[in-house]
A protein has these predicted regions:
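Domain-level signal for Mg2+-assisted phosphodiester chemistry and nucleotide/NA-binding surfaces
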Residues: 1-86, 99, 127, 134-135
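Short, well-ordered alpha-helical scaffold segments within catalytic/effector domains
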Residues: 27-28, 87-92, 114
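Active-site histidine-anchored catalytic micro-motif
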Residues: 99-138
Length: 138
């Protein structure tokens, strides 16, 4: 049985799914599909912490499914822009996990991960499958 890892860019998946389909992404269905493909060794959801009750409920639901949650503070800048980017954290975790996995799944439409995916494939021989909203995936 393949050892698999799941890495989720929660903000990216939330907004692209909501904008395209008008609803939330079904993490329970994803877990069912991927757990049928192998043994899930690690599953991490990377999110921002806005200290919001609905977000805490969502994070609790993800934990019940089997995800561990990594939170980064949500920073609202004076100019109105926001910061809560997990690209570097996801990259580090995937690179550190690659030697222990047979297959990786990245949920994000962020094109910045292309070099990471190629590095994992070349240096570790581990295939990385990307899940994202096709119209909004770079």
């Amino acid at each position: 049985m393949e050892k698999i890892g799941i890495f989720v860019d929660v903000q990216n998946i939330y907004y692209t799914t909501k904008d395209t389909f008008g609803r939330q992404f079904n993490y329970r269905a994803l877990w069912k599909i991927l757990s049928a493909r192998g043994q899930i060794m690690t599953a991490v959801a990377y999110a921002t912490d806005r200290n919001d009750e609905s977000q805490r409920k969502f994070q609790t639901a993800l934990r019940h499914i089997g995800f561990s949650i990594k939170l980064k503070p949500y920073i609202q800048r004076a100019d109105g822009s926001a910061k809560g980017d997990w690209d570097v954290g996801i990259t580090i975790d995937m690179l550190q996990s690659a030697a222990d996995l047979d297959r990786m799944f990245l949920l994000s439409g962020d094109g910045d991960f292309d070099l990471l995916i190629q590095t994992i494939k070349i240096d570790h021989g581990v295939p990385v499958e990307v899940y994202g909203v096709p119209e909004l995936t770079a």
